[in-house]
């Protein structure tokens, strides 16, 4: 007999009913006679139930029914997969008549039709009319074994337990894999020698006679499943929209990283090129680490580190370093791949850790030697004579800028933001340059005086004057004086070039052209006043002026343009006249120059003749 219990209206979000929320998809839950327990009904329900006497009568014939069912199960286990209709009819005859009457389809349909409303009967008609899904075989059929009692195929809320399990699997890395590994360890797979054999029960058809053996399928499933495989449970999980995936198995990152570093170090030390080996044959063997001496996390690691530190502290560099070799002869050591970027890779931290005092002194000596070579180089001497020693001047200027607080900012930016500050800085710089120039001029005078005194002392050695003319000494003085003057002029020009450029830029930016003055005067005549800051006429200003005033402005501008054209023609005529006069003057100068050259040559010839006559 089937019992139908109405649920009524229940809020699935209420805390007390959340665990039963998945059972709210149908208005009725069917319980078969095999699923319904007597403890579910009260005494009053049993008395009101019209089928209570038939149940009592049914219990008397239950023993014969169980015996017949056990015989069917034994046949299935022995491999007798075929059951004839005669045997099924005979077995049904062994069942009492009361039980057969209670299981008749007509009586069940008539009782359900009396107890169900029309709407509910029409909705649940598919379950009653479908022979593949009878009302009492929901727990017997192997297709629906995994479902809980009262759970419908359509899941509203979802499998709460499955979702929680998935969240735990996402949080705990490697949960499933570790669980499966433990299960495989527990099973004695080494003892399996034969292949897996099937007993053929999966090929049985679900007939009316084999459905009776549905209760024992749970017991037989453990026997029929292959050894070492897990039982697959059929579920109706809610499709998850979570894009996260289960992470892979975890492994020990510490040991992996330690192995990686050890392997990398070994590769670096083993992949040294042969050239470097030939260049440095006297390397200490203690600098190269040994793989056998490395112990990760051991007590001997600290001792090894102390020994290495002591060896490094007591080490002395016997050979020259790459840096000093490159400084000594860059052409020779430029082919060495280790010395290509030596100067860029020179680091103070490396010096503090890897160099001794002796090596630093050697480096200092090498730098001094290189500086001496640079000083005695002819090209460097020519550059210093032509331009002068810029380094001292630049250093002094940088110091002065640092003291004034300019701090590597351009004077143009200072002049744009704060003109007073820029003027003060420029004034200080000009004063500094003037003092520098005065010092250099005094030094040149002292040098000239010393040279004159030396010449005089050389001419009056031992009180005997030497008969030498004064012409060579005057020539030397003239040369050194001109050289000093040229150097001073070059330095002044270099020092003032920035100031002059800034002044020109200011004049271009803030300078007032005559056209601007003319436009302002014309606008003032009309009655429009412009500030000194406004240098351009905007379109908005012109649109506000009336048409006759604009016409007057246009006429004034045309008159001014005509006057400018007249003055331009007059200035061009004057330029032509001046060019012609200049050509005449240059022609006259050329004649005079030729005359003087002729006179000089003739005078020299006369002097030569006179000298030869005196000598003769």
UniProtKB/Swiss-Prot annotation:
Localization of this protein: Cell junction, Adherens junction; Apical cell membrane
Any GO BP: positive regulation of hippo signaling
Membrane topology: Peripheral membrane protein
Keywords: Cell junction, Cell membrane, Coiled coil, Membrane
GO cellular component, one term: adherens junction
Domain of life: Eukaryota
InterPro entries: SCHIP_1, SCHIP_1_C
Region (Disordered): 38-71, 204-251, 292-320
Residue stretches in coiled coil: 550-594
Family: Belongs to the SCHIP1 family.
Protein name per the record: Schwannomin-interacting protein 1 homolog
Organism: Drosophila melanogaster (Fruit fly)
């Amino acid at each position: 007999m089937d019992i139908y219990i109405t649920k009524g209206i229940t809020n699935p979000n209420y805390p007390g009913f959340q665990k039963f929320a998945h059972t709210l998809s149908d208005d009725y839950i069917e319980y078969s006679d095999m699923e319904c327990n007597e403890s579910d009904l009260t005494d009053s329900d049993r008395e009101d139930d019209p089928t209570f006497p038939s149940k009592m009568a049914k219990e008397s014939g239950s023993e014969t029914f169980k015996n017949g069912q056990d015989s069917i199960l034994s046949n299935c286990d022995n491999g007798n997969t075929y059951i004839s209709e005669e045997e099924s009819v005979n077995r049904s005859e062994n069942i009492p008549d009361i039980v057969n009457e209670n299981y008749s389809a007509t009586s069940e349909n008539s009782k359900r039709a009396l107890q169900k409303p029309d709407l509910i009967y029409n909705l649940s008609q598919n379950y009653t009319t479908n022979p593949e899904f009878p009302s009492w075989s929901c727990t017997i059929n192997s297709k629906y074994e995994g479902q809980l009692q009262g759970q419908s195929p359509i899941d509203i809320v979802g499998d709460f337990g499955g979702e929680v399990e998935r969240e735990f699997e996402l949080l705990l890395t490697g949960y499933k894999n570790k669980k499966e590994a433990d299960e495989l360890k527990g099973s004695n797979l080494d003892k399996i020698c034969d292949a897996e054999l099937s007993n053929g029960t999966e090929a049985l058809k679900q007939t009316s006679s084999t459905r009776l053996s549905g209760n024992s399928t749970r017991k037989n499933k453990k026997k029929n499943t292959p050894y070492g495989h897990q039982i697959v449970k059929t579920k109706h999980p809610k499709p998850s929209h979570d894009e996260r995936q289960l992470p892979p198995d975890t492994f020990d990152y510490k040991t992996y990283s330690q192995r990686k570093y050890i392997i990398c170090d070994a590769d670096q030390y083993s992949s040294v090129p042969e050239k470097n080996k030939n260049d440095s044959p006297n390397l200490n063997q203690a600098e190269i680490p040994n793989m056998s001496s490395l112990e990760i996390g051991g007590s001997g690691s600290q001792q090894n580190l102390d020994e290495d530190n002591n060896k490094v502290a007591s080490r002395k560099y016997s050979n020259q370093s790459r840096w000093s070799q490159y400084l000594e002869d860059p052409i020779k050591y430029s082919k060495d791949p280790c010395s290509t970027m030596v100067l860029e890779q020179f680091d103070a931290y490396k010096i503090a850790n890897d160099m001794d005092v002796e090596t630093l002194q050697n480096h200092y000596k090498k730098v001094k030697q290189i500086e001496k070579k640079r000083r005695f180089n002819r090209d460097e001497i020519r550059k210093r004579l032509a331009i002068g020693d810029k380094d001292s001047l630049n250093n002094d200027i940088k110091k002065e800028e640092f003291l004034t607080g300019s701090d590597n900012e351009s004077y143009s930016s200072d002049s744009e933001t704060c003109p007073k500050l820029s003027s003060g800085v420029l004034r200080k710089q000009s004063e500094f340059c003037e003092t520098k120039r005065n010092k250099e001029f005094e030094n040149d005078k002292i040098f000239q005086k010393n040279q004159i005194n030396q010449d005089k002392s050389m001419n009056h050695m031992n009180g005997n004057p030497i008969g030498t003319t004064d012409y060579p000494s005057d020539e030397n003085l003239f040369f050194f004086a001109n050289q000093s003057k040229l150097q001073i002029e070059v330095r002044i020009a270099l020092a003032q070039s920035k100031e002059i450029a800034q002044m020109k830029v200011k004049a271009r930016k803030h300078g007032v052209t005559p056209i601007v003055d003319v436009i302002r005067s014309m606008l003032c005549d009309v009655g429009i006043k412009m500030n000194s800051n406004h240098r351009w006429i905007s379109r908005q200003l012109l649109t506000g002026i009336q048409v006759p005033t604009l016409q007057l402005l246009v006429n004034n501008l045309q008159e001014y343009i005509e006057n400018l054209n007249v003055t331009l023609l007059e200035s061009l005529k004057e330029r032509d006249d001046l060019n012609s006069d200049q050509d005449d003057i240059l022609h006259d100068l050329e004649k005079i120059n030729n005359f003087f050259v002729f006179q000089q040559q003739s005078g020299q010839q006369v002097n030569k003749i006179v000298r030869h006559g005196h000598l003769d």
